[in-house]
C-alpha cells in the first residue's frame, strides 16, 4: 500500500474547510449535521482525502449518535488505530492507513457480529452509490 503524503497547503487546496478540519486537524463535526449520518443508500464509503475504500453500506447501522456508524471496515488493512487521550478521555482513533486522515473513533458498544461501533465523521467520507461502484 503506497502512502499518500501531501503538504498542509496541498490538503487545504484539495479539501473543503470542514473536510480539512476533520481529517487533517482531528476535528469532529457536530452530531446530526453530516451528510451521511442518515444515508441508507447502498454503496461504498471511501476516504475523502485519498479515495481508499473504507466501509460498505451493508455494515452501516443507526447507532442513534448522529454520525455514520459501521460495525466493520471493508478491509482492516485500509484503516489503522491509535490511542487518543484528548479531551480528558481514553478512546481509540480510527485513521486512513493510506493518508493518515482522521476518520473518527471506534467503540466497543456496537452490534453483533463484531460488537464494534466505528463512529466516523461524514466529512471524512466520500460515498459512491452501488450502481456507480459496480460499473
Curated annotation (Swiss-Prot):
GO terms for cellular component: cytoplasm. It catalyses: L-methionyl-[protein] + [thioredoxin]-disulfide + H2O = L-methionyl-(R)-S-oxide-[protein] + [thioredoxin]-dithiol. Zn(2+) binds at residues 47, 50, 96, 99. PROSITE patterns: MSRB (PS51790). This is Peptide methionine sulfoxide reductase MsrB. The active site is at residue 119. Its cofactor is Zn(2+). The keyword Metal-binding applies.
Amino acid at each position: 500500500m503506497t502512502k499518500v503524503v501531501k503538504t498542509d497547503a496541498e490538503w487545504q487546496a484539495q479539501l473543503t474547510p470542514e473536510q480539512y478540519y476533520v481529517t487533517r486537524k482531528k476535528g469532529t463535526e457536530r452530531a446530526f449535521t453530516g451528510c451521511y449520518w442518515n444515508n441508507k443508500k447502498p454503496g461504498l464509503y471511501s476516504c475523502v482525502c485519498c479515495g481508499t475504500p473504507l466501509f460498505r453500506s451493508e455494515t452501516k447501522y443507526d447507532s442513534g449518535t448522529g454520525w455514520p456508524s459501521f460495525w466493520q471496515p471493508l478491509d482492516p488493512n485500509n484503516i489503522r488505530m491509535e490511542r487518543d487521550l484528548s479531551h480528558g478521555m481514553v478512546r481509540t482513533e480510527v485513521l486512513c492507513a493510506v493518508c493518515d486522515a482522521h476518520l473518527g473513533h471506534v467503540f466497543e458498544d456496537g452490534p453483533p457480529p463484531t460488537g464494534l461501533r466505528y463512529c466516523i465523521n461524514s466529512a471524512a467520507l466520500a460515498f459512491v452509490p452501488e450502481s456507480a461502484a459496480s460499473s
